[in-house]
């Protein structure tokens, strides 16, 4: 089991927590998370379409070709993770129920560098924030392995 801690100070909820102190109950990292099944979009945006989108991306205007979704049950926790077409989500990714219902948003960007590699910055910190948000909303926290595995699967698919 790994205890997740914040690197700096946390001033949220009028609580200052010194560096190195657990912020929330430990969330177990599981090595039992199965590989993410790949059912990617068979007709993703073309290079020209992507270039136009990246020139003026906006917010909530364009959606990704693919998403990772998983099922949660009390008996198994998070399981059946799969990369699927973004349009495969019921009603699409822009529906109000998804954005105004009880949900969590955690932003993370992956950047391509001059050496051709793709980098993210501290995805473990994003996973921790996502877990903390889940605790606040009484939702089951997503294990760090699954969170980062989903990011890796999406980045691999998008660079293909």
Pin down the residues of each PLM region.
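Conserved alpha/beta cores of soluble small-molecule-handling proteins
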Residues: 2-160
């Amino acid at each position: 089991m790994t205890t997740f801690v914040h690197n700096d100070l946390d001033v949220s909820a009028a609580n200052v927590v010194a560096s190195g102190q657990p912020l929330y109950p430990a969330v177990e990292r599981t090595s039992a998370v199965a590989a993410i099944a790949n059912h990617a979009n068979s007709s993703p945006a073309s290079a020209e379409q992507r270039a136009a989108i990246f020139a003026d991306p906006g917010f909530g205007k364009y959606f990704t070709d693919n998403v990772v979704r998983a099922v949660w049950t009390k008996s198994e926790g998070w399981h059946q993770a799969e990369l699927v077409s973004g349009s495969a989500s019921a009603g699409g990714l822009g529906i109000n129920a998804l954005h105004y219902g009880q949900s969590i948003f955690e932003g993370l960007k992956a950047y391509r560098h001059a050496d051709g590699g793709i980098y993210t910055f501290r995805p473990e910190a994003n996973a921790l924030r996502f877990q903390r948000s889940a605790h606040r909303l009484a939702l089951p926290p997503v294990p760090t392995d699954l969170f980062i595995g989903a990011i890796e699967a999406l980045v691999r698919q998008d660079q293909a």
